[in-house]
Amino acid sequence: MEREKGVASRYRPFVDSLYERTPANSTVVSKKARERLAEHHAEKVMRRYDEDIVRGWNAAVRTFRTFPTIFRAQDFTRSKFEEALAIVRANSFEVTRADGVRERVLVPLAHLLVHDTSSSVPCVKMVDDTFVINVDEHRAGDELSCSHGEYSDAETFARFGTSAVYSEENNARDVITFTFPDEVHLKEEIGSCGPAEDIGFTRDGASAELMCALRLVSANATEWSEMRKPNFDLQSLKNRPLSEESEVAVYDALFATLTDLLNSYPYSDVDDEHLLRGDRLADDERRAVKIRLREKRSALRALNTVQYRGRKALGGVLFDKHFSHIMPTRVKDEL
């Protein structure tokens, strides 16, 4: 996809360098070689690889059909997909999540290369056998950018390509799920709070399941001793805090998550609305922007509700003491 976009793609230089470093034909396994793998562990690995190809291609086809202008089917063939998947496999590493699901991680080469921030145009070049990439000016901690545009195909795919819901209307559950990092060693206890798909944010703020999970991971040693008693009902944490100290930590996590999410969008609501008022978007591009805007609005409504409930639960004085630097006044939902 990024290779087809040419110089307009901010990721094209990185993708090209992957292909240059790992020629596709170097990853091909011949039929004869496969036969020799029979009854060996490597045969299972190859079978998993084949299954990944089938699953990935089926998901890609669904995406092409949903966004035909962004992802033109004639640009993406099964052979190209298999080639790209082979490149990713050759330049990535596999991790297994706490729930047993395997994921393959491709570290963006942009973070491994020397950067030149003096240019505002996408550019990659070799200087003394070193890749140098020109990127836009940025502040420390900002995501590096190598191109300009009102929307990005890669961004759209990254946010919505693996979603089961492609609609500008609210989905059936209208929830932004919250995933705990793998280093949280309370997966079984968190499971007592409710199904993973219910742990998240809705327009009504943090779900009861999310509040329960956050209260679990925010508990101090004394509170944990209490919760380990046989008669303690973990589900009661959906509706009641453990202590003032722990509840402050819970709301700190809620605000940090929602503000990070809202700040992660590369375009403002005004930008998206401007795009939607114009006539430059194809139908599927318009749908993608609406999906993004809907998610953003859901997050903003959730933030407003969390702020209201936090002030009510902790009291105005305590709430302002801990969170006035984040939100000195109530967030106004103008959407």
Please give the residue ranges for each predicted region.
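Long, positively charged leader/targeting segments at protein N-termini
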Residues: M1-E334
